[in-house]
């Protein structure tokens, strides 16, 4: 799976997103705000595509705002996929779809961190210079598949289910509940991950112990800013059913591809994710928020 990309409280220096499964041009570009132009609003009943002049995102010609969170897209990103990402974010944050977020503390931290998602069509699209203090995540146009869930969770996976969840977890849960979802050693999440990996590995081991069920081996994925968030994604989406038909595709990283396997094998993460304090989503987003 693609390594989670995040902006970690960026200083004034230019920062570019990186991706473990693809080679993205690291050369920075300088951007300036653009004057909004006419943008087709789309046909979603809940979200409107708008032009913007937000600092640092000049190469992204439009955006959708979900509960105050910006989702930017370059011109080559299809409207249907931009709106799909917006609906997925809304469904993760308001999983019972009653019009109010399920965990206000998580959203508050996302807003405090000025969280954002950027949607790109080519690798060069994410050579950006966001303002200091923003946390972000990227999602590709071609890896977004609005029909994955509708088609019985078969066919090409919908990366929106992963990347949108990453920014919610990274900018929201990790800050709202550092003892539970913090990404450093000693949090409940990290402790559960250490069990799942068969030990506490600050760097990727040459091989994981027999019996480990989380075996991510990307050497660019560090313990505190990647491994924990990937682990959280695997566990939560497996509990929601996203991985039930994908074992052959994911077994090199994750073995517990069903809710039953997570519950019976990874009791620590199951207990954390079902703790009512955190009101984690239980229904897999399908991109049809309140429809």
Explain the meaning of each model-derived region.
Residues 59, 66-205:
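Acidic/His-rich structured neighborhood in mature extracellular/periplasmic domains
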Residues 15-46, 291:
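Bacterial Sec-dependent N-terminal signal peptides
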Residues 172-248:
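Post-HExxH zinc-binding segment in Zn-dependent metallohydrolases
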Residues 232-291:
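Pan-zinc metallopeptidase signature
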Residues 73-80, 152-156, 217-229, 253-261:
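Conserved aromatic-histidine-acidic binding/catalytic patches
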Residues 2-3, 107-111, 222-225:
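A general structural signal for short secondary-structure junctions and capping/turn motifs
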Residues 1-20:
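Sec-dependent bacterial lipoprotein signal peptides
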Residues 44-55:
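Catalytic-loop region of hydrolases
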């Amino acid at each position: 799976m693609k390594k989670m990309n995040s902006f970690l409280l960026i200083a004034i220096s230019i920062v570019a997103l990186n991706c473990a499964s693809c080679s993205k041009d690291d050369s920075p570009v300088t951007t300036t705000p653009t004057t909004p132009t006419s943008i087709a609003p789309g046909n979603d009943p809940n979200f409107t595509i708008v032009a913007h002049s937000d600092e640092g995102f000049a190469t992204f010609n439009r955006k959708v705002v979900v509960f105050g969170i910006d989702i930017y897209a370059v011109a080559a990103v299809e409207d249907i996929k931009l709106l799909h990402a917006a609906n997925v974010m809304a469904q993760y944050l308001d999983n019972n779809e009653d019009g109010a977020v399920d965990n206000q503390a998580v959203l508050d931290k996302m807003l405090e961190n000025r969280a954002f998602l950027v949607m790109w069509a080519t690798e060069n699209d994410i050579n950006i210079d966001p303002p200091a203090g923003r946390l972000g995540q990227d999602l590709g146009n071609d890896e977004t598949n609005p029909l994955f869930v509708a088609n019985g969770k078969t066919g090409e996976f919908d990366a929106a289910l992963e990347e949108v969840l990453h920014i919610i977890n990274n900018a929201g849960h990790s800050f709202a509940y550092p003892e539970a979802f913090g990404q450093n050693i000693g949090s409940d999440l990290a402790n559960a991950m250490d069990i799942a990996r068969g030990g506490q590995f600050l760097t990727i081991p040459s091989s994981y112990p027999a019996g480990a069920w989380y075996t991510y081996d990307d050497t660019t994925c560090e313990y505190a800013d990647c491994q924990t968030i990937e682990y959280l994604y695997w566990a939560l989406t497996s509990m929601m059913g996203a991985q039930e038909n994908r074992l052959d595709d994911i077994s090199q990283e994750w073995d517990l591809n069903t809710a039953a396997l997570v519950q019976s094998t990874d009791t620590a993460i199951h207990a954390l994710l079902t703790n009512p304090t955190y009101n984690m989503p239980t229904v897999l987003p399908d991109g049809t928020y309140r429809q």
